[in-house]
Swiss-Prot record:
Keywords: Cytoplasm, Developmental protein, Metal-binding, Repeat, Zinc, Zinc-finger. Zn(2+) 2 binds at residues 164, 167, 172, 177. One of its GO terms (biological process) is pre-miRNA processing. Gene3D superfamilies: Nucleic acid-binding proteins (2.40.50.140), Zinc finger, CCHC-type (4.10.60.10). Residues 1-22, 178-214 are annotated as: Disordered. It holds the Pfam family CSD. Disulfide bonds: none annotated. This is Protein lin-28. GO terms for cellular component: cytoplasm; nucleus. A zinc finger (CCHC-type) spans 139-156, 162-179. It is found in: Cytoplasm. Zn(2+) 1 binds at residues 140, 143, 149, 154. Residues 48-116 form the CSD domain.
Length: 214
């Protein structure tokens, strides 16, 4: 750190450093008005209120509680519930909470929701929603199975030719499969066979005829 010569001290012969202006940190002691307050002793943002769960939708993750004093319906979201794992409330469950205005302006909501004793965990609902399927099953028209693959990438059929997805045969397609006669109603099978015959006749009529010898 640079030093300068003070002109007003000892006829300009005393050396002076800006560090001389810093307080003596070694002997500095905190006074009561300088101490950092303990957050454990800070007052709560609002009074603690008490009520009961009116209803709670476990699938959507929200519901309402009824305040004991005002009988007001207060919105409650699962993210404000003091519990581990799947968070929900059981109908009629006793709770304590703070109250604040909702961010969307639609009334008030309960937050920091716990049991009747502040910080106590909640029991939660006995109903849990069914888990969502991780994959959607589609029917592959090449192998006929319900799976997550598509026909163009079917792992069950090794040939590029059309196959019957009812029985897997390469000799015919599903519309004229003998297995369908056994599994479906006779009138449905008859209609499908008639349609298949009509298509075959149209194909034969449109095919070029070869020259025949007399």
């Amino acid at each position: 750190m640079s030093t300068v010569v003070s002109e007003g001290r000892n006829g300009g012969n005393e050396r002076y450093s800006p560090q001389d202006e810093l307080p003596d940190l070694e002997n500095l002691k905190l006074t009561d008005d300088m101490r950092v307050p303990s957050f454990d002793r800070l007052p709560s943002p609002t009074p603690r209120y008490y009520g009961s769960c009116k209803w709670f939708n476990v699938s959507k993750g929200y519901g309402f509680v009824i305040d004991d004093i005002t009988r007001e319906d207060l919105f409650v979201h699962q993210s404000n519930l003091n519990m581990q794992g799947f968070r929900s409330l059981d109908e009629g469950e006793r709770v304590s909470y703070y109250i604040q205005e909702r961010s969307n302006g639609k009334g008030r909501e309960a937050y920091a929701v716990s049991g009747e004793v502040e910080g106590q965990g909640l029991k939660g609902s006995r109903i849990h929603p069914l888990g969502r399927k991780k994959a959607v099953s589609l029917r592959c028209f090449r192998c006929g199975k319900f799976a997550t693959h598509k026909a163009k990438s079917c792992p069950n059929v090794k040939t590029d030719a059309k196959v019957c997805y009812t029985c897997g045969s390469e000799e015919h397609v599903s519309s004229i499969c003998p297995e369908r006669r056994r599994k479906h109603r006779p009138e449905q099978v008859a209609a499908e066979e008639a349609e298949a015959a009509r298509l075959a006749a149209e194909t034969a009529a449109s095919s070029p005829r070869g020259d025949h010898d007399d």
